[in-house]
UniProtKB/Swiss-Prot annotation:
It comes from Salmonella typhimurium (strain LT2 / SGSC1412 / ATCC 700720). The lineage of its organism: Bacteria, Pseudomonadati, Pseudomonadota, Gammaproteobacteria, Enterobacterales. Changing K525A: Decrease in activity. GO terms for cellular component: cell periphery; symbiont-containing vacuole. Converts phosphatidylinositol 3,4,5-trisphosphate (PtdIns 3,4,5-P3) to PtdIns 3-P and prevents the transition of PtdIns 3-P to PtdIns 3,5-P2. It is one of the known effectors injected by Salmonella into the host cell and is required for invasion and for an efficient generation and maintenance of Salmonella-containing vacuole (SVC). Alteration of the phosphoinositide composition of the plasma membrane causes membrane ruffling and actin cytoskeleton rearrangements. Contains the consensus sequence Cys-X(5)-Arg characteristic of Mg-independent phosphatases. Keywords: Hydrolase, Secreted, Virulence. One of its GO terms (biological process) is negative regulation of cell growth. InterPro entries: IpgD/SopB. Gene3D superfamilies: Cell division control protein 42 homolog. This is Inositol phosphate phosphatase SopB. GO terms for molecular function: lipid phosphatase activity; molecular function activator activity. Its EC number is 3.1.3.-. It is found in: Secreted. It holds the Pfam family IpgD.
């Protein structure tokens, strides 16, 4: 199909929008033609496409003048293809501009992958903006809207279509394995859609194999990005669970403007997290389904920065804490509807007890001190629930931990050590600084929860980046503990062996897949290089390998919400 063939039927503004889009896409991706051999597959790159600009140009001559990035061009192609699909749902699948572009992209495919150039990277980042401008130009042409109103409509329409596409794709269990020192570990991420007793998922408003992505910020019916995360080891001929917890996005439907709906939505999300927590405890779930009123302890660890200076996360934390408080009044029994093995909805009775923390882990919190005071006002109360009123490091633990230790369990030493470490961190405000370990308090709270048979749950705003790094830090320490029978000291960088474990976990924990599930591209936004360098957190030192660091970062910097 010739691009020129549809120019005559488009308005001048539509033509201008398309020309800009065409230039961005084609100049960025460089359509392949003429002579030359495609380069070999880039190390650790995940497959996709390639291209050139001028007839007769060859890869060798072209690449000599281009600075390569760390991103696979194939990954950029997949991202752009998905964005074109979203635009097509807004403009119509037969839109000539998008059809032509899609055809050109198909023609551009070659078998081998290579690192993208900086120009191609910039083009991929700009594509979404240009597609929205194209939609705005079409809207302005067809409906006669003012430019600003047309652009606002286009941005909302594109976002809604993208959220729908991400939600409606299959949400399936992610399972990866890694081996270290002869031990075989399995990391499993189970989405809400696959939390099943029978043929259907357990939730009253069924997911039906789909999900709720992190960008669905007005959803008041489901928790965002809800998964059960597990790490197990295969030994003595069977699989042994080393850790299990629930991960999700913030409970606040923060783009819902109606205060009442926002409150109802936060409670609904909290109920889904409690339902998932109950599902993670099969024996407790069976008792509840048999009609028994069961007590459910949950340690919720928010990872947001409790400040409204940037991003309004302070209000989101308030919404989340209010939801937990409304469901966990002393002695309060709540009723949850769960779909049983026959597919019927059944009411179960639970007495939820939630120790609700919030620990800022980004640069705003750990480098600039934003939100620390607000977070610690919640954390003090939650620590008293967990460890008792005497938080001196040398004091005997009380609270939930004291009750657990009174049984003299097999994991007495691990529980006691974790409790002491948490008290030390709290006393010295170590969680207010990076100190070589941004997640030092959050990670230990989750581990301690699991060790005392409570359910750990953790979340950031989206449930994918900070939440994903928390997931990886937990699994790194869990595997290290299994290997060495020792807990790391708070604020310590992993040694070479610990770094090897961390590297394997980062690439095989399922977090890259969850990020792609939510945005269309794999990569963790917490991996960044800021200027001045003093603002950077300690991830590069903790990971210990630049290539792994770049792989974990992925194409996150090219994705805009």
């Amino acid at each position: 199909m010739q691009i020129q063939s549809f120019y005559h039927s488009a308005s001048l503004k539509t033509q201008e929008a398309f020309k800009s889009l065409q230039k961005t896409l084609y100049n960025g991706m460089q359509i392949l033609s003429g002579q030359g051999k495609a380069p070999a597959k880039a190390p650790d790159a995940r497959p996709e496409i390639i291209v050139l600009r001028e007839p007769g140009a060859t890869w060798g001559n072209y690449l000599q003048h281009q600075k390569a990035s760390n991103h696979s061009l194939h990954n950029l192609y997949n991202l752009q293809r998905d964005l074109l699909t979203v635009a097509a749902t807004v403009l119509g699948k037969q839109d000539p501009v998008l059809t032509s572009m899609a055809n050109q992209m198909e023609l551009a495919k070659v078998k081998a992958d290579r690192p993208a150039t900086k120009q191609e990277e910039a083009a991929a980042k700009a594509l979404k903006k240009n597609l929205i401008e194209l939609i705005a130009a079409r809207t302005q042409q067809q409906d006669g809207l003012p430019a600003k109103e047309a652009h606002r409509f286009a941005a909302v329409a594109f976002r809604d279509a993208q959220v729908k596409q991400l939600n409606n794709q299959p949400w399936q269990t992610i399972k990866n394995t890694l081996t270290h020192n002869g031990h075989h570990y399995t990391n499993t991420q189970l989405p809400a859609a696959e939390m099943k007793i029978g043929a259907k998922d357990i939730f009253p408003s069924a997911y039906e194999g789909k999900g709720v992505c992190s960008w669905d910020t007005k959803n008041i019916h489901h928790a965002n990005n809800l998964w059960m995360s597990t790490v197990s080891v295969h030994e003595d001929g069977k699989d042994k669970t080393l850790f299990c917890g629930i991960r999700h996005g913030v409970l606040s439907p923060y783009h819902e403007k109606d205060p009442l709906l926002r409150h109802v939505g936060a409670e609904n999300k909290a109920k889904e997290v409690l339902t998932a927590a109950l599902f993670s405890k099969p024996e407790l779930l069976n008792k509840a389904l048999a009609g028994e009123a069961v007590s459910l302890k949950l340690v919720s660890v928010g990872l947001l920065t409790a400040s409204n200076i940037f991003g309004k996360e302070g209000t989101m934390v308030e919404d989340q804490m209010r939801a937990w408080q409304s469901l966990t009044q002393p002695g309060k029994m709540i009723h949850l509807k769960i779909r049983n093995k026959d597919g019927d909805l059944q009411t179960v009775k639970i007495k939820p007890d939630v120790a609700a923390f919030n620990v800022g882990v980004n640069e705003l919190a750990l480098k600039l001190g934003f939100g620390l005071k607000a977070s610690d006002s919640y954390n003090a109360e939650a620590l008293h629930q967990l460890l008792g009123n005497d938080l001196r490091p040398e004091a005997r633990p009380g609270g939930w931990v004291g009750e657990w230790l009174a049984q003299y369990p097999d994991n007495y030493e691990v529980v006691n050590t974790l409790a002491r470490q948490i008290k030390d961190i709290w006393k010295n405000n170590q969680h207010h600084k990076d100190g070589g370990e941004p997640y030092k308090l959050a990670q230990r709270l989750a581990m301690l929860a699991h060790e005392i048979d409570a359910v750990p749950a953790w979340n950031c705003k989206s449930g994918k980046d900070r939440t994903g790094m928390m997931d990886s830090e937990i699994k790194r320490e869990i595997i290290s503990l299994h290997q060495t029978h020792m807990l790391s000291a708070p604020g310590s960088l992993p040694d070479s062996g610990g770094q090897k474990i961390f590297q394997k976990v980062l690439l095989n924990s399922g977090n890259l897949e969850i990020q792609k599930q939510n945005t269309g591209g794999a990569g963790n936004k917490v991996m960044k290089n800021l200027s001045p360098e003093v603002l950077n957190l300690s991830y590069q030192k903790r990971v210990g390998d630049e290539n792994i660091w770049q792989s974990v970062k992925g194409i996150s910097s090219l994705i805009t919400s």
